[in-house]
């Protein structure tokens, strides 16, 4: 799997959350992490990403992992540091 393919999978997943959260969501591509197991994608509301106005920031939007081998998506969490969640994939 390529990063482009993983990005498409992540974007479809994030777009599927828009109705639930009530706003347009975007991937923060400059924050994407590549690891041996796959890619870690971050997302936020389009308004917050474009304006930086915290009134439009999402809460609880944990990074998602797209696995390199099969394209499966795993959601992380926000209670622990990101590295704690990523250890399970290494």
Residue ranges, per PLM feature:
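Charge-dense, low-complexity polyampholytic segments
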Residues: 23, 28-31, 87-90
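Short, non-transmembrane alpha-helical segments in secretory-pathway proteins
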Residues: 1-28
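Histidine-/acidic-rich catalytic cores in large beta-rich domains
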Residues: 3, 11, 52-54, 73
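A short, surface-exposed interaction/processing loop segment used at functional sites
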Residues: 60-87
